[in-house]
């Protein structure tokens, strides 16, 4: 298997894992799932209602379906600070993420 083929297979695997996790989060607690993923209600509805066949087809994209929500260097650096305790880091992360805008369908 070539390096490109291997990378595409890994992208597909990550995509499928991400979509399945997203669906599980949304089905168990829609509001919390939307918060954790930073997505709009419209996008949450689309993701939650995908059939298995649609989910697998979408996962087969050659592009990553998830992306870093931490596109601010200072934010990412503060969350990765090894000097903080895990509990403080998680609380700080939740506070910072609550201030991030949700993604919408474009």
Curated annotation (Swiss-Prot):
Pfam families: FlhD. It comes from the Bacteria. One of its GO terms (cellular component) is cytoplasm. Keywords: Activator, Bacterial flagellum biogenesis, Cytoplasm, Disulfide bond, DNA-binding, Transcription, Transcription regulation. Gene3D superfamilies: Flagellar transcriptional activator FlhD (1.10.4000.10). SUPFAM superfamilies: Flagellar transcriptional activator FlhD. The keyword Chloroplast does not apply. One of its GO terms (molecular function) is DNA binding. InterPro entries: Flagellar_FlhD, FlhD_sf. Transmembrane segments: none annotated. GO terms for biological process: bacterial-type flagellum assembly; positive regulation of DNA-templated transcription; regulation of bacterial-type flagellum assembly. It is found in: Cytoplasm. The C-terminal region contains a putative helix-turn-helix (HTH) motif, suggesting that this region may bind DNA. Homodimer; disulfide-linked. Forms a heterohexamer composed of two FlhC and four FlhD subunits. Each FlhC binds a FlhD dimer, forming a heterotrimer, and a hexamer assembles by dimerization of two heterotrimers. Functions in complex with FlhC as a master transcriptional regulator that regulates transcription of several flagellar and non-flagellar operons by binding to their promoter region. Activates expression of class 2 flagellar genes, including fliA, which is a flagellum-specific sigma factor that turns on the class 3 genes. Also regulates genes whose products function in a variety of physiological pathways. Belongs to the FlhD family. This is Flagellar transcriptional regulator FlhD. It comes from Burkholderia pseudomallei (strain 1710b).
């Amino acid at each position: 298997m070539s390096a490109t083929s291997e990378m595409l297979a890994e992208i597909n695997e990550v995509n499928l894992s991400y979509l399945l996790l997203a669906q599980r989060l949304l089905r168990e607690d829609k509001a919390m799932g939307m918060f954790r993923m930073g997505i709009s209600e419209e996008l949450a509805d689309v993701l939650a209602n995908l059939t298995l066949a649609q989910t697998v087809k979408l996962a087969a994209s050659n592009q990553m379906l998830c992306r870093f929500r931490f596109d601010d260097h200072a934010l990412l650096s503060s969350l990765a600070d090894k000097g903080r305790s895990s509990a403080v880091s998680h609380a700080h992360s939740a506070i910072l993420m609550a201030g991030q805008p949700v993604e919408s369908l474009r």
